[in-house]
Design a protein with these regions (language model features):
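PRPP-associated nucleotide enzymes
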Residues: 1-140, 148-225
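Short active-site segment of divalent metal-dependent hydrolases/proteases
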Residues: 145
Length: 225
């Protein structure tokens, strides 16, 4: 992998590096016992840094705004919902970022497990928020890998009368060869692909070609279908 000349500094990727939000090699095994050469850890350390979380929320908001603008949907009410638990604060940060603009976005929240109240309309719901069929729902998550949690979230929201219009993630690992429409019936967008992230860290001399090639080889050989 060759260096890119005159690389433009990316404040988010620099922040990921400085805060240790991107784990490589043995660090992944130590933290999560996973056998992967790279892990995007938008959890503990991100939650401790509210400035970084706010920056990421603004970036997700700007991406969502550009997507709806391209689809000529700026006049359509929008809502973001994060896949629990990791993306719950990401979605909330996105909605909060929008409140400072002329294009506010609504917020909804999911539970990992349905509520266990005795009964009533919301007693067994996995969703907390307004159900408005006029809104376009964007599902927020940290990483796209197999798509399993996305399919689960879409099914749960459908039970509540919500249809997901699009999925927006921070990093897309691009480890899926195909996704059948009945499994994931909406487009996927991201702030970064795994290749873009790796190229940036190589070009800024944070990792070398050996590490980069190991990561990309792993991603390209471990596919989800």
């Amino acid at each position: 992998m060759s260096l890119k000349p005159n690389i433009v500094t990316d404040s988010i990727l620099e922040g990921f590096w400085e805060k240790g939000l991107v784990l490589f090699g043995d660090r992944v095994q130590e933290e999560y016992a996973l056998k992967t050469p790279i892990f995007i850890d938008l959890r503990h350390k991100l939650y401790e840094d509210l400035d970084m979380l706010s920056t990421l929320g603004h970036a997700l908001y700007e991406k969502l705004h550009s997507l709806t603008e391209c689809d000529d949907c700026l006049d359509v009410p929008q809502q973001v919902i994060g896949i629990p638990d990791t993306a719950t604060p990401l979605a909330l940060a996105t909605a909060l970022a929008s409140q400072q603009t002329s294009w506010p976005v609504n917020y909804g929240q999911m539970r990992k497990r349905p509520a266990s109240y005795p009964g009533g309309r919301s007693g067994g719901s996995s969703y907390m928020g307004t159900v408005d069929p006029k809104r376009q729902v964007t599902l927020i998550d940290d990483v796209m890998a197999s798509g399993r949690t996305k399919r689960w979230a879409i099914r749960e929201l459908q039970k509540e009368g919500l249809t997901v219009t699009r999925i927006l993630v921070v990093v897309d690992r691009k480890q899926y060869d195909y996704i059948e429409q009945d499994k994931l019936p909406c487009p996927i967008y991201s702030l970064y692909t795994i290749t873009e992230l790796i190229e940036y860290y190589v070009s800024s001399r944070k990792i070398d070609d050996v590490v980069a090639n190991q990561i990309l080889a792993h991603v390209n050989t471990r596919r989800f279908t």
